[in-house]
């Protein structure tokens, strides 16, 4: 038995979906514990592309139970459309393979409206939110006025919450943002219908996980976004609205922290970032554009082009510290093929000092200059390689340098988008 947390070690989009899909073969349960449909996992299985925003990536495997924990914010319309697409693809979604925490909070139409109205008003100072209502939903959760999944089956409670919340939201939308008000009655009927559709899947995920632990099952916890988008530990304010670090796996699913056995970090072989915020190793040249094109670096949720740059080990080492990582899972190594000279950021120069971990203040980070180590690239196609020793010598040197800088062993090296285009050095289960 092992309970393993998978997190992103950079700014999200590291390729966690493929890794979770790979490890699900030996897991019994796959659990989402934070975030919402602002993140997308892209998987390629048997040449077919699947994009998930809310349903855990393990849904493609028969006999596995996927769970959406209490720490996730759920847009029920998005979830139902995702379930319908899976059904059309021959993967029916039932309580045999998907459970939703009754305590997960629900994204409402006024959350999306507020999200977009605020972002539009900010103009050039906007953060780059996806506009999916994630942040406003978490705000209502903290303000103790949010709608939870179990409320969707209670017409009285749902109606009262919608009407009470719309008093404030409509006032702001009309008077402050100049937007049209939302209709409470129509919203209530829409969400009661969602509740009826989702009711068979709603359960106490915390209790089900405790039963799984007692039975000695393998549980895989699937993080969304990346460490440096964490609301507390990320590059604030250019962050998401939830805790993305491994410590939230327990809180966001209802399992005790002592039940977690291992925490593994996914690291893209280069670095990407979506939206605003500091990015010390960003490339604004042909190499950066090459990474974006070859790596398909466009958001699975928004389609926005991602900013690209060299692998930054200051970013990765900070993630190792924050999450207590015991292994690294390298993705998109094949994207670097054909680049003559590669660079890795080894430290930052901040005035007279050299530092190896990210400074917590945004202003300090923006003032830092990256210090690089240069490596020879490789020309050979590595997509068919399945053993580490069969990789080109320069590829191995790049990975070995990464591992040495991290002080944490490599467990997986992905050499292509497909499930089988992977070198597995160690399984966590």
Swiss-Prot record:
Enzyme class, first EC level, given as a word: ligase
Positions contributing to GTP binding: 12-18, 40-42, 306, 332-334, 414-416
Recorded family membership: Belongs to the adenylosuccinate synthetase family.
Binding site for IMP: 13-16, 38-41, 130, 144, 225, 240, 304
UniProt-listed NCBIfam families: PRK01117.1 (NF002223), purA (TIGR00184)
Provenance organism: Syntrophobacter fumaroxidans (strain DSM 10017 / MPOB)
Family matches, as Gene3D superfamilies: Adenylosuccinate Synthetase, subunit A, domain 1, Adenylosuccinate Synthetase, subunit A, domain 2, Adenylosuccinate Synthetase, subunit A, domain 3
Coiled coil spans: none
UniProt GO cellular component terms: cytoplasm
InterPro entries reported in the protein's UniProt record: Adenylosuccin_syn_GTP-bd, Adenylosuccin_syn_Lys_AS, Adenylosuccinate_synth_dom1, Adenylosuccinate_synth_dom2, Adenylosuccinate_synth_dom3, Adenylosuccinate_synthetase, P-loop_NTPase
Transmembrane intervals: none
Quaternary structure and partners: Homodimer.
UniProt-annotated location(s): Cytoplasm
Catalytic activity of the protein: IMP + L-aspartate + GTP = N(6)-(1,2-dicarboxyethyl)-AMP + GDP + phosphate + 2 H(+)
Biological processes annotated in GO: 'de novo' AMP biosynthetic process; IMP metabolic process
SMART domains: Adenylsucc_synt (SM00788)
Co-factor binding details: Binds 1 Mg(2+) ion per subunit.
Annotated GO MF terms: adenylosuccinate synthase activity; GTP binding; magnesium ion binding
Gene it is expressed from: purA
Binding site for substrate: 300-306
Known EC number: 6.3.4.4
Name the UniProt record assigns to this protein: Adenylosuccinate synthetase
Main localization (coarse): cytoplasm
Catalytic site: 13, 41
